[in-house]
Amino acid sequence: MRGPVGVRRDIEDTMRMLKLLRRNWCVLIDDRPSYLGMLQKIKDYVTWGEVEPDTVAALLKKRGELEGGRPVTDEYVSEHTEYDSVEEFARAYCEFEAELDDIPKLKPFFRLHPPRGGYERGGIKKPYTLGGALGYRGKAINDLLERMI
């Protein structure tokens, strides 16, 4: 949501560790406790939730980028992984059977547009629970990502 400019050094370092280097970038991480602690630390600058396989597949197909700027295709996934399509890989990823590192040369972030229709009414300065866009939002992250892809 918000970029790392003008923030405390420890928050900037945490955002760098998560590869969130610019506004409107997206990374997919699992729910291990160390990641959840990092998200709590930067909760006033990002939003997060649980993604569905359809959203992961759309992210990979439309915004996934390989080294050299090449797009992620079904052919590339079937040649370089044990999965036949991006949708099958996304399903396996959401069930914790695959990692994004299984796709060779995939960049670890997704560069997204600002959301169509804007952020929630409270903007990017209030938490999601108070009508804003920041912090934990659960399954509602899928709606936001669909508007940003």
UniProtKB/Swiss-Prot annotation:
Subunit structure: Part of the 50S ribosomal subunit.
Annotated keywords: Ribonucleoprotein, Ribosomal protein
A single cellular component GO annotation: cytosolic large ribosomal subunit
Family: Belongs to the universal ribosomal protein uL30 family.
Protein name: Large ribosomal subunit protein uL30
Source lineage: Archaea, Methanobacteriati, Methanobacteriota, Methanomada group, Methanopyri
GO biological process, one term: translation
Organism for this UniProt entry: Methanopyrus kandleri (strain AV19 / DSM 6324 / JCM 9639 / NBRC 100938)
Record carries keyword Ribosomal protein: yes
Xref: Gene3D superfamilies: 1.10.15.30, Ribosomal protein L30, ferredoxin-like fold domain
GO MF, one annotated term: RNA binding
InterPro entries for the chain: Ribo_uL30_ferredoxin-like_sf (IPR036919), Ribosomal_uL30 (IPR039699), Ribosomal_uL30_arc (IPR005997), Ribosomal_uL30_euk_arc (IPR035808), Ribosomal_uL30_ferredoxin-like (IPR016082)
A Pfam family recorded for this sequence: Ribosomal_L30
